[in-house]
Regions:
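Short alpha-helical DNA-recognition segment
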Residues: 21-42
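Short, charged recognition helix plus adjacent turn
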Residues: 1-2, 70-82
Length: 82
């Protein structure tokens, strides 16, 4: 199972992809989370990491779940271990 750093990177990649596709803007993410737009920009460029609080806020506001960041094979592997 991936750790927080890996999940953080996956969330960042997902957000960067959505920004690239025009589904959301850096400013929009800033408004949703209360985090400054420059900080969001630096996160998307890999210069900063999201705090757990900010990651949770983004997941909540974008109607995502941490499970959305997992590969289906990872979920299956986790379920088989339980």
């Amino acid at each position: 199972m991936p750790g927080f750093r890996d999940l953080n990177q996956r969330l960042t990649a997902l957000l960067a992809d959505r920004v690239r596709k025009g589904e959301v803007t850096e400013r929009g993410l800033s408004r949703l989370t209360g985090v400054s737009q420059p900080h969001i920009h630096n996160v998307l460029k890999g210069k900063r990491f999201l705090s757990t609080e900010t990651a949770d806020a983004i997941l909540h506001e974008m109607h995502l779940d941490v499970l959305d960041l997992l590969d289906p094979r990872e979920l299956l592997e986790w379920q088989q271990r339980r």
